[in-house]
Amino acid sequence: MVASGCSDDDDATPTTTSATPTTATPTTAAPPTTTASSSPAAGELTVQVFFLDEDAFNIGRPPYLRPVERVVDEAAPEAAALDRLFEGPTAEERAGGLRFVASQATGVSELRIEERTAHVYLAGGCNSGGSTFSVADHITGTLVQFTSVDAVKIYDPDGQTASPDEPGDSVPFCLEP
C-alpha cells in the first residue's frame, strides 16, 4: 500500500483563514511529537496538527495519523492550526517518517464553523491521485481536537462537497480514491 502524493509537503503554501475562537482539547491519538519551538507565550496556545505516519501507512498498521505540537494564536486556533498543518512537517519530523499529503491543495481559502461543523474550503488544486489517504484526513484529524468542532465538511476550490446538507463529515469527489 503506497500513499500517492506523499511528497506534497514541500508544495504547500500557508493561507490565512478565520474561525470562531475556542480552546483545544486533547485527542486520543498517539502521543504528540514535540518540536523545539518552546512553550506558548501570552495569547498563544499549543495545539496538535496531524501528519501521515508513512511507515504505519505503508505496512497497513493504523493509526496513520501522528500528532505533533504547534504553538498558535489563541484568538483563532482552528484557523491557525490549519495554517501550521499546510506548512508541513519540520525537517526533523520528515526524517522521522511524517508526511503531509496536500492532494494538490495549497491551503484553505475559508474556514467557517457553524453549529459545531467546520466548513473548510480548499485553495489551489484538489486531487487524491487515487490514494485512500488525502489532505482530508489531515484536516479532519487536526480540527476535531477542538471543542467547537464535531464534524468537518471539506469543499473543493469550486465550493463543492459530496454531502453538503447531510449531518457528519463530507469530502469533495476529487478527494475520493
Give the positions of each predicted feature.
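Bimodal "functional hotspot" detector
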Residues: A3-P177
